[in-house]
Amino acid sequence: MAKKYCYLFSEGNANMRELLGGKGANLAEMTNIGLPVPQGFTITTEACTQYYEDGREINPEIMDEINRYIVKMEEITGKKFGDKQNPLLVSVRSGARASMPGMMDTIATQSGNPRWAWDCYRRFIQMYSDVVMEVGKKYFEELIDEMKTKKGVTQDVELDADDLKELASQFKAEYKAKIGEDFPTDPKEQLMGAIKAVFRSWDNPRANVYRRDNDIPYSWGTAVNVQSMAFGNMGDDCGTGVAFTRDPATGAKGLFGEFLTNAQGEDVVAGVRTPMHIQEMEQKFPEAFAQFTQVCQTLENHYRDMQDMEFTVEHGKLFMLQTRNGKRTAQAALKIACDLVDEGMRTEEEAVAMIDPRNLDTLLHPQFDAAAIKAATPAGKGLGASPGAACGKVVFTADDAVEWNERGEKVVLVRLETSPEDITGMKASQGILTVRGGMTSHAAVVARGMGTCCVSGCGDIVMDEANKQFTLAGKTYHEGDYISIDGSTGNIYDGIIATQDATISGDFGRIMGWADKFRVLKVRTNADTPADAKKARELGAEGIGLCRTEHMFFEEDRIAAFREMICSDTVEEREAALEKILPYQQGDFEKLYEALEGCPVTIRFLDPPLHEFVPTEEEDIEKLAKAQGKSVEQIKAIIASLHEFNPMMGHRGLRLAVTYPEIAKMQTKAVIRAAINVQKAHPDWTVAPEIMIPLSCDAKELKYVKDIVVATADAEIKAAGSDMKYEVGTMIEIPRAALTAGEIAKEAEFFCFGTNDLTQMTYGFSRDDAGKFLNAYYDAKIFENDPFAKLDRDGVGQLMQMAVKNGKATRPQLHCGICGEHGGDPSSVEFCHQIGLDYVSCSPFRVPIARLAAAQAAIAEMED
């Protein structure tokens, strides 16, 4: 049987979203429940896919079916397409199955009589030129403005039939000047041109970015709705409007929306005239308004969610043009979900499943004032690496950030890229802006952990660090100049934009409570400081899945001792230097155990290569030489010897413990002593340290380091007269470790997937450099998503699945988690649930996102 590419609204229903798109499925559903919908048909998403397969052409089979359905519309309406006496006038609109407001191009095609007809016709020429032929709207807007000036009026509605007729003529001339041919007059040519334009819009740059941000596959395609026209611009007894069944900003129950008399739908959306509040429609059109309020109630009860509707009143008669689940703020989403449960319309599981976890970000961070940000124009754009809004004076070094902050100045730290040395400056800043680096760069990861706004990878910035200035969009910014950055969108603004503090309502607690009832995955946090750990606990973390010990070495009072260790010539000298650091490490760990109140804490031993810790400033090198009793030249020679061509795959992780076992011994002593002390202070807690050895690729290598750790730990426990239990596990972040997980599990008591490095090594991409070519990959349709932001299930995911399966076959009680940045990405959390991980670990401010995503994964599995 031949594939069916067209469906009348009466032939479809709400369950056919994949085929008819969201708009088409909802038009069919409204038709089925007896609402007043201008009739028409939907061209399926499969026709869009076929259009691309056929080299961006509508093939004869699909064209014939479209023509047959036009005939069916003629039979339904009693009008004839292209007829001068009784024309069937249609609109052609996109219908992607996921709502894409403002991303898809929409066309209304019409023709007709006197003022109304010329108004329709000039609109049609303008929209057809803009959307189908891609002639910019601005040329036509300029002609309209000239006409209004000439006639001494301010609004389009004040132009009469002759003015509009003249405009139509000017528009046609503009079309010919731009396109080089006459405006088409054949309705069938216009119709096919409009349908092709909607198909084309599926592949426009805005739609591609939107899809990537919202996990919508390119392969879905868009449907096209061909619908008989309802006119709101035929006179004062006509109008058009957009309304929501609840307030999309607050979630409050009640009709919210706008209405315009004698206008078409795009006038409301485009804001060319100031509309009336929806309640004022009652005075103008009492009967249509009464019917509309009834329709709103019917739709909300039917879909059991807040609805966003478009409608037209033609000579007092109501027509529904669209309904969809309305976009809403995160705050409104929580209120609506809770209210729908209280009203008996939704179950707790359904309420949890309704919330987009990614939107919770905005509840936990400062945001820009909505009106101020709407009025502002970005000066540039990077990657929205850590959400929130920041405004402050530009500084270029971490030291300056600290100094300015101490004197009460709010600052934004601008760097080419950040390194662990910049931590203190990052903490002192309102926000961080980097020229280089991606979503998992050092700046991004650390900023997310601290809950600080960060925009990374703005390659348009021309940096001049020597003179403490940078240039963006033709303007040079000096130290002390104000900028504002949006860590959610990646936008960068000149000057000051007002911000608002984050607010969390009681609805947040209710939704999170329900989520915790349903989820199976535990949620931990990546935290290196007691403050981070405390914040994560407040947001619901059940332990620490990753504590990076190297960040602790950069504190002023301990970096000197660590540098002494690096520059030592003998084991004894190294041990003496490490002995100075031991009490600091122990103190840090005690504070973390205290903050976690007996919840599990996974401590990763030293991971970065040693060159990251050595001084770069002449003054610091001289200080180190003096402390070591060496010459400056000797210290410089040691620093030079630490240089590596590929440090990511160099002398780091457990390789450091193999060559310098004394480092692992010191860290083990610190972990165990801290745990014993905290356990003694809190006998009712269970303090059970988890020691994580990073970067293993071979079971023998892991055994070598584990033996050192176990011997040291057991000696400490025996000396303290304790019976403390501890575990030693490893990070799976090298493909070979995943492939040999069965062997590695003989030594490891737990696995934690470090998916940042596992992704780098599986792809062979550097996460800090991938931004240079990923956009080209998106444009070429090679990739649809950033593999560092959304877990690659086909490659990295398969390695993880294999490692879990083989590891648990060797050691059934092996527990497995993830601590890469993917631990806070909802689709990645879903995958972790599916492959049987025990926990995910993410930055503190992503903990609620992970809790909700884990619950949704469990609910989806129950439904299957």
Model-predicted segments: where are they?
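Short, flexible loop/turn elements at secondary-structure junctions
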Residues: N13, A96, S228-N233, A398, ...
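Glycine-rich phosphate/ribose-binding loops and adjacent secondary-structure elements
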Residues: G316-F319, L416-K427, G431-L433, M439-V445, ...
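Extended, non-globular alpha-helical segments
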Residues: K381-E421, L472-R510
